[in-house]
Amino acid sequence: MTARISSQRYAVEGFQEALDLCYSRGWTDGLPVVPPTEPAVRAMLDAVGLEPDAQVAFITNRQVAISAEKVAINAVMAGCRPEYMPVVVAAIEGIADPRWGYHGPATSTGSAAVLTIVNGPIARRLDFNSGDNLFAPGWRANATVGRAVRLVMRNVVGTIPGRLDRGTFGHPGRYTYVMAENEAESPWTPLHVERIGCRPTDSAVTVMAALAPIQFYNQLSSTAAGVLGTLCDTMRYPGQIGQPNYCVVLAGEHMRTIAADGWSKADIRKFIFENTTNTVAHFKRTARMPGAVKPEDETATRPLVQSPDDILVVAAGGRAGSFSCFIPGWASRTSSEAVTVVIKERSA
Amino acid sequence: MAGFEILDPTVEPRRQPLTYVPRPDSLKGKRIGLVENTKFNSDKLLQRIGIILKTEYGAAEARMWRKHNSSVPAHQEIIDDAKQTVDVVVAGIGD
């Protein structure tokens, strides 16, 4: 690949000056970055077979085209290996999809992060963590792919805290928020196969505008309904009507308990959908809906999401521990929805 | 370490000329459009603004549209309708 890289170049004396320049220009997320040299950027582009000026995505509301060159530069800065580049590109395609609705999750006071779920053989080949310490530091793929997406949002699209990003709290997932599904041990159909009809041998990423994970504990139940009953009780009360998606992440012990009862992911979704409704009276008393409580509000109920299919069920997390978690989506169904994108790997 | 070059990760925003309609000197007799963004009470706030623009500034009328949701620009039907039916638009968002 010899097409010219058109980005402006800055000569530096060494690593420290490069780092100082990146900080002074506001190009980092606060952590040090890898200096994006041309050879490193070329290696990223080669990994996806894209010319520097190829358009990866277009953010309509910002009228910004995201070129392969800029994705590659930011992926280098984030610390990605070139092999991760197809995953970064697919995630960028996902957040530029009109269904994801970039402007809202990127800008809102509601502080969504880009939850990124990797499925398929690429997850295992590149050592994306799907097990112990699922969201913790220590795995280069999880740490740097999410960081690369965030740096693209910052440096290319202008999603900068305090300016176009007005999050009230933000959350730690805005550094990186990436997991893989534990397909090797899961008894269930993988997420990408369920959502867009991929073959299990395909790889894909699912991006969801997401708040922080909320963990629950159930060490007592030996049944699917028992475990999920605790989940539903935990989900119901912090929930708000109209959220677009929830992601439910079932870790090893709960996964095995639920599967032993023969429940599929569809069964899990249906149970959660039916057991997380709240009364209109509850929503009004807790100021999630306007208006005075009327007698009929005590029996009128609302679900947390519009459809059971809006609940993403993922098998991931440590093998030990009677914990699982759920992750609320951001805002409303008309504002943003999870998007699954096939990862295009360069054929050898 | 020898000197080397690094590449700029940012993009220059694409510049495009934007022409604003001149603000009217007065709202007297003007037709007011109010674009409501679906957030709680945004309709009430804009209704109140519409009343103030009529009673205190002499606007002729005020009508309201509702966006699909608060995170997107006003949809095309609103823009097309507003072009035909009002002279001034007030859009509001509040958190």
Roles of regions detected by a PLM:
Chain A
Residues 1-348:
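Non-transmembrane, aqueous-exposed alpha-helical and coiled segments at domain scale
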